[in-house]
Each structure stands twice: as C-alpha cells, then as structure tokens.
C-alpha cells in the first residue's frame, strides 16, 4: 500500500535546478569579489539554505551573507529560476500518486514565492495539497542554518494535519533500511519525506517520519546513507516503487 502522505523537496528531487542556482551563485560571488569559473564546484549550493552555504564555504559573516543572497536573488529571480527542468518521469509519478489518493506536499528551503513560481511554471502545482517554503527573514537568519529544513518539514506536516509528539516505537531499530514491517509501529511512518540531500533526511528524522533519499539529485548515496535514509531510490522509477510499496 502506498504512503498516504508524501512530502517532497523541490531542487534536486523534482526538478534539475542546478544550472540556474550555480550560475546565480557564481554571479553573487563575482559581485562579492570572488571568482569561481567551475560551476560544478558550486553544486553543493543546491538544496541547503543559502545563508549556511555562503557562511560555511566562503567564510562570510552575517553582513556579507546578506549581500551575497541579495546578489543571488538579482540573478536567480529573473533568469536562474527558469534554467531548470522537471526530471523525466516526475510528472507521471505525481499523477500516479495523486490518482491513488496520496496527499502530496512540498517542503523546500527555497523562498515560498519562488516555490510557487517553479511549480506553476512547470504545471505541477495542482498536485500538491500543501506547499511550504522559507520566508525572507528565515533565509537571512544566520541562527537558523541547517534547522531551516527541519522547520519546513514540520510546517508541511502540520499542513497535512500531523501534529503532536510521535508515538514511541517498540523497536529502536525501526528506521533501518529494509525493515518496512517495523515502520508500521508508528503512525508518523506512514508519512514520507523525499529529498536528495542530508538536510532532507535530517528534517525527516527530526520530525519522526520516513526518510526517502534520491541519489539522482545533488547528494550522493553515501551522504544519504550517513544521514540515516530509510530507503534510497537511484531513479524516479525506483522512487515510485518505494512510495507505492512501503506505506502504512
């Protein structure tokens, strides 16, 4: 039986957004006096909160981070947002899940207005019951950092009606990959969070829902394994099989 409530990350999970994001980061760095000709080196910016990436990768302070994000938006909001494509098979997956009655949500660190623009641009907004992204103040809040995704997942779960504390599971190893029968011990495990980075898996774990990683995005299989993914899909087709086979 399929998961009845499924949260998706956006960048690197539903859409191949790397080109637009990396070029916009490159532009922002140039404006800050930093030259980075190799776009591949900027791919780690896809997924994590921007403030965290600029701080950790370029040692920027709070004021510099705010300026870098401003320059990033100058490029991304008008051009980079459209240098993007839906991964092959994603439309069909969303249609299938929608038709079988699963409720779908977006939990993204991207600013919420941008999330809506991307989904509407590709004509897939209608599949989602709940769409959650960050607010400007959250994106700029240097104290938020990696906790941003945890909050987005929590908000999306609340939008789907899941509130309160998780029930205790009898088996402490209930999150191990390959143990679908144990996932049924906790109602929250009928909810899945799908993403391509450790931040997505951490967001799922912190909110006690099933963590489903996808290795076709911008994070490696190793990153997902180390973050404790319950399941990992190497293709969109495999993701579909996981989401329709292991839900409670």
List where the protein language model places each region.
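Metal-dependent phosphoesterase signature
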Residues: 55-92, 165, 173-174
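Short, acidic loop-to-helix structural element flanking the phosphoryl-transfer center
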Residues: 2, 78-106, 110-116
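Substrate-recognition "cap/lid" segment bordering the active-site pocket of phosphatases
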Residues: 112-192, 198, 202-206
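Acidic, Mg2+-coordinating phosphoryl-transfer loop and its flanking beta/alpha structural elements
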Residues: 193-231
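A short acidic, helix-capping loop that chelates divalent metal ions and anchors anionic groups
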Residues: 53, 76, 80, 115, ...
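Structural recognition of alpha->loop->beta junctions
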Residues: 123-133, 223-243
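Active-site neighborhood of HAD-like aspartate-dependent phosphohydrolases
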Residues: 1-44, 58
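Helix-loop "lid/cap" segments that line or gate small-molecule binding pockets
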Residues: 28, 49-62, 118, 152, ...
């Amino acid at each position: 039986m399929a998961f009845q409530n499924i949260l998706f990350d956006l960048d690197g999970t539903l859409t191949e957004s790397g080109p637009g994001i990396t070029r916009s980061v490159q532009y922002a760095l140039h404006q800050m006096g930093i030259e980075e000709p190799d776009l591949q080196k900027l791919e780690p910016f896809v997924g994590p909160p921007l403030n965290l990436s600029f701080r950790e990768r370029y040692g920027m302070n709070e004021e510099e981070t705010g300026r870098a994000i401003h320059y990033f938006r100058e490029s991304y909001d008008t051009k980079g947002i459209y240098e993007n494509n839906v991964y092959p098979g994603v439309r069909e997956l969303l249609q299938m899940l929608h038709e079988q009655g699963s409720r779908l949500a977006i939990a993204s660190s991207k600013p919420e207005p941008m999330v809506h623009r991307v989904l509407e641009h590709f004509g897939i907004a209608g599949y989602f019951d709940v769409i959650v992204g960050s607010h400007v103040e959250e994106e700029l809040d240097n104290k938020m950092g990696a906790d941003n995704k945890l909050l987005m997942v929590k908000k999306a779960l609340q939008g789907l009606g899941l509130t309160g504390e998780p029930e205790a599971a009898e088996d402490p190893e209930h999150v191990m990959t390959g143990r679908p029968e144990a996932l049924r011990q906790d109602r929250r495990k009928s909810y899945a969070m799908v993403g391509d980075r450790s931040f997505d898996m951490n967001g799922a774990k912190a909110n006690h829902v099933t963590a489903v990683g996808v290795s076709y995005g911008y994070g490696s299989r190793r990153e997902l394994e180390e973050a404790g993914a319950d399941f990992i899909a190497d293709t969109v087709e495999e993701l579909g099989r996981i989401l329709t086979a292991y839900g409670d």
